[in-house]
Amino acid sequence: MSRIEQVAPYIATKKTNYRFVVLALIFIVYAINYADRTNIGAVLPFIIDEFHINNFEAGAIASMFFLGYALSQIPAGFFIAKKGIRGMVALSIFGFSAFTWLMGTATSVLGLKFIRLGLGLTEGPCPVGLASTINNWFPPKEKATATGVYIAATMFAPILVPPLAVWIAMTWGWRWVFFSFAIPGLVIAVLWYLLVRTRPSESPFVSKGELETITAGQATPDARRENIVISPGFSRLDRLIRVRDLSPISTVKGLFTSKNILGDCVAYFMMVSVLYGLLTWIPLYLVKEKGFTFMSMGLVASMPCIGGFIGAIFGGYVSDKWLGRRRKPTMMFTAISTVLMMVIMLNIPQSTVAVCVGLFFVGLCLNIGWPAFTAYGMAVADSKTYPIAASIINSGGNLGGFVSPMLAGYL
């Protein structure tokens, strides 16, 4: 008898909160996922110098990741909808960790491009699986908050990555950045497979009481699509965001023809374009155009992510608690405020403090609505079709990550 089987009867007799252990694992997995994809930005200056390439070619190396990432999303969504989350996510973590290691072995620009493509292909299933895990493991009243923690991982990793990657590159060489970053994922892949199941009802660590908490309030075919808290105080806001009484989508055709899913996908494309344009090129821009040293660049380049970390958690909480599970308001706020902040950044004074403050608020504004882009689909689709809905949104959205680094490099 395994250790898990021995402790399961004891766990089942007491009220558990194991979903938060799962959420902690989701945070760690996605932080590693993002660290492995964004470390390229910190080492691009070293790669440009070694391979004697221009900015457009450097942007193409970074962009190849997103081509693979977008291509693998929808197939992963179908697989997860049919076979479940557990094995696919573990395999994805192992795969992208292996390709991260291979980045350090590349001897040509072409090799770097193909490995980045492979990194994208293997990372693609991960966010679909993680978002589906949140959808399965959390009640509606906690989904945006949990999604905020999940999205915050995307900002937590880049806070640490630039200074850490630059230090490793300057101490041992840029290749050791990839060797070092590959190791944690190999460990987490095993832990995920051992500790997480597709649904809480399958887990030996979840009590009956917690299972009842998770299933309380979940959408039914007759439920209001956006699963919101109805209150007279929200009547004007509901008219503005056009709340409708529609049942969750239960067919693949319905997902691909849904204006809500496709609209979310297009909006996500725009936001991802901004995010990865920043993450890829801010380090090089600060060194080449603003005259920052490599070490000071690492700190300043982390500012959008510090703001983003706070914004993601705060935005998810606001959507769940203050806005009665309405997702569109924070999405709209993010779109408008990010545009305003980008205009401000074009005219920011030539001051380290001003640049740091400006980049902090860019990250904050960009990420307040970020959890809503993921959580919105949880109410539009039912639990069985949500992995496919998530893959459509992520696939289309992350094409922005393919376009923006190359376009920014060209400009």
What are these regions (language model features)?
Residues 71-110:
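Conserved MFS/SLC helix-loop-helix module at the cytosolic interface between two early adjacent transmembrane helices
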Residues 94-107, 336-350:
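C-terminal ends and interior cores of transmembrane alpha-helices
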